[in-house]
Amino acid sequence: MAKLLRYSEEARRSLEAGVDAVANAVKITLGPKGRNVVIEKSWGSPTITNDGVSIAKEIELEDKFANLGAQLVKEVASKTNDVAGDGTTTATVLAQAMIKEGLKMVAAGANPILIKKGIDKATSKVVEEIKKISKKLSSTEDIAHVASISANSEEIGKLIAEAMEKVGEDGVITVEDSKTIDTYVEFTEGMQFDRGYISPYFVTDPEKMEVVYNEPFILITDRKLSNVKPLIPILEKVAQTGRPLVIIAEDVEGEVLTTLVLNKLKGTLNTVAVKAPGFGDRRKAMLQDIAILTGGIVASEEVGINLEDLTLQDLGRADVVRVKKDETIIVGGKGKPEEIKKRVAQIKAQIEQTTSEYEKETLQERMAKLAGGVAVIKVGAATETELKEKKHRIEDALSATRAAVEEGIVPGGGITLLRARKVLEPVLNELTGDEKLGAQIVYNALEAPIRQIALNAGYDGAIIIHNVLSKDDVAYGFDALKGEYCNMYERGIIDPAKVTRSALQNAASIAGMLLTTEVLVVEKPEEKKPAAPEMPEY
């Protein structure tokens, strides 16, 4: 396949055209008065959105050289979205501002490598300042504010705050379609897994077809139970206490199942048998989770624990165990809190190391089940188009809120980046030559987001910036929705620090790469030959 090449200044101008195409489409959505973009779909109804990353992802340019620039900006948006769940538009606006000014300097003869060095030094200084400005979330109201801003809806903000309050920092919150037009939160307390009773004869509530036991013992094993003899000693010990027994095993069959059912029907021993969740290594890990949560042990051949030797101390305990046809819920496990914390920390470390998205999800789910529970936000809407858009907003807001809990919050509306510029003044005095130009690029770009927010709301950015900087208060800024100057924290206009930091770092990274680009190589499009020769004219 033949290639086309473009060099130096011409190459950079092509990249700039691609950057502008994406950035100009995305930046009109910034702020509370950002506009919408309608995106055509190859099938189904068009999508209406004001989410930066969704718009950027849809853009492909016909000019292959310009398209390279467009793809680089898309990378900024999606990278920021992956890390923080929000801030994609801010990242795009920052990247465009840095690239535009940087290209002017390179065209005037500045050294791109030194400019990049200056950009990197300035960025790390501003990131430190963002960390200093940030403050931890102190209340559910703060969480609701962050979520409301990201989702552009107070109702969604309250739902996310409610869900996060219930499941805690490490809990899992999932987003699913509702069967009605209402949007609400469902909460599952305790450890829940998708395995139910092995036989319906265990049912204690025939109306609901479920088994409910208060303060049961829990026997956990990774074996198949078919021979009843090794189980008799522990069954007798439990029967003497008069408390119920829940057995979680790889499988329960033959005489063991018959014995358990008969004892249940006679009232000698209230019991239920449940298959262990998961498969292979995941099953072993989940059984260990259940054991730690309930304060028991896993009776496994691998560690040489025989069923005959089990004592009541080896069994897990819980406040309530509820077993349905295909799910089991353990509420109020009696495991030691410090052991549970250790296990959660261990799973957290695994999440950080894994690269597989699926593995990450399953580990987060396991951590949530140990840490407190699972909340499901059921999303309802009148039409399919509205449902898709609403679901997307909730998922974004959820990521942004998690980021806020993780690294704290900063004043929103582009104020933090604008005020963080002051740390660059000593840097600009220290640096010389082209490195100084790089730092100057970052300094100037930091006002781009607030300028764009003001512009989208119909105000003059220069006047807004002047008035905001007239006061030294870090939280003093401009509410573009109401057109008023105010304390951003009090007004609830806040951003997660992680979002602001990621937006700046990703924008600076792409700007540096683009400015140091000298050659573009693309594939030469093939000329399509007609399927058949043209008919001769007579």
Curated annotation (Swiss-Prot):
ATP binds at residues 29-32, 86-90, 413, 479-481, 495. Keywords: ATP-binding, Chaperone, Cytoplasm, Isomerase, Nucleotide-binding. Pfam families: Cpn60_TCP1. The keyword Ribonucleoprotein does not apply. One of its GO terms (molecular function) is ATP binding. Its EC number is 5.6.1.7. One of its GO terms (biological process) is protein refolding. It is found in: Cytoplasm. The keyword Cell wall biogenesis/degradation does not apply. GO terms for cellular component: cytoplasm. Its main location: cytoplasm. It comes from the Bacteria. It catalyses: ATP + H2O + a folded polypeptide = ADP + phosphate + an unfolded polypeptide. Belongs to the chaperonin (HSP60) family. Forms a cylinder of 14 subunits composed of two heptameric rings stacked back-to-back. Interacts with the co-chaperonin GroES. Together with its co-chaperonin GroES, plays an essential role in assisting protein folding. The GroEL-GroES system forms a nano-cage that allows encapsulation of the non-native substrate proteins and provides a physical environment optimized to promote and accelerate protein folding. HAMAP family: CH60 (MF_00600). PANTHER family: 60 KDA HEAT SHOCK PROTEIN, MITOCHONDRIAL (PTHR45633). This is Chaperonin GroEL.
